[in-house]
């Protein structure tokens, strides 16, 4: 349910189909709240991503607890047989703590995925790494 109404799967499927017919470039489809968030009583973000068969980029906050949440998400995405391109970490605090400093390298090592770490309230994005340039 979205705002008390059934989730509009049919409309989304139709619009994504038209978009795919008319546009050859990459698609960016944003999830909400996390990989396993339900969108209605039977389907969620994971199932939507599986239906679309698009590559996945995990976006996570860079703070204490991120390792566990991100590793669980990466494992679930891999079990879903989807292509996982990498992880983007957003710094959500102006004062980095020890975990936010070590998280990027640890996640690269533990997931064997590229990790892009974005600084707190950056006004200018860094150059995109090669694994994100198709997006």
Annotate each language-model stretch with its function:
Residues 1, 55-58:
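Short amphipathic alpha-helical segments at helix-loop
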Residues 1-43, 50, 62-71, 75, ...:
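ATP-dependent carboxylate-amine ligase catalytic core
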Residues 28-30, 57-59, 88:
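Structural motif
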Residues 46-47, 105:
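Active-site phosphate/pyrophosphate- and oxyanion-stabilizing loops and adjacent acidic/basic residues
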Residues 52-55, 83:
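Short glycine-/polar-rich loops that comprise or flank the Walker A/P-loop
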Residues 74-135:
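C-terminal lobe/tail of nucleotide-utilizing enzymes
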């Amino acid at each position: 349910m979205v705002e008390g109404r059934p989730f509009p799967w049919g409309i989304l499927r139709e619009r994504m189909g038209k978009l795919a017919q008319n546009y050859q470039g990459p698609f960016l489809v944003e999830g909400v709240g996390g990989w396993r968030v339900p969108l209605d009583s039977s389907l969620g973000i994971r199932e939507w991503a599986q239906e679309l068969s698009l590559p996945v980029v995990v976006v996570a906050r860079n703070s204490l607890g991120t390792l566990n949440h991100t590793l669980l998400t990466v494992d679930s995405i891999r079990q879903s047989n989807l292509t996982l391109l990498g992880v983007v970490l957003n710094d959500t605090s102006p004062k980095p703590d020890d975990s936010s400093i070590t998280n990027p390298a640890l996640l690269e090592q533990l997931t064997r995925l590229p990790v892009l770490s974005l600084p707190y309230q950056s006004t200018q994005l860094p150059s995109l790494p090669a694994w994100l340039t198709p997006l």
